Amino acid sequence: MKLFKYILFFVCLQINLHAVAENVPTAIQDSLKVLYPSVQTVGWSTDQDYYVAGFQHNGFDMKVWFNNKGNWVMKQTDWQVMDEVPEAVYHTFTFGPYSTDEVLDVTLVEFPKRKSQVVVHLEEDNAETEYQLFYLTDGELINARNVTNLNQILGANTFL
């Protein structure tokens, strides 16, 4: 019975993703091709009033949010580990109060008209408390939010 539920879930998900992909305006698809001409395989979804393109680029998972006019409003690159973060962010994190905690994920978030951010998702050492730390690329920690019992998705609700 569980297997049937999983199969049904994935079939419904595929139908939904296919329906979203068919309804993405041409202007938005063209904008993605201008930004990332080499990307071939794209999964489309929606987040509030935005179309979201998900794909692999240079070995990283990426997502780009587009408004209805075809302008990108947010890009996310899933770095997963601290190896890619700017030196200033690494320094602030390493000498900060969360340095002994386990890093679960690291995401670069870029915007066309405001400063980029690096979000470090971590779990406190010897606890089940999870945080998202929001850094500017110059190393300034601008927010530390407890996400233990919250939706941890970095989407339109978080940034737009």
Locate each region found by the language model:
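Bacterial Sec-dependent N-terminal signal peptides
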Residues: 1-24, 32
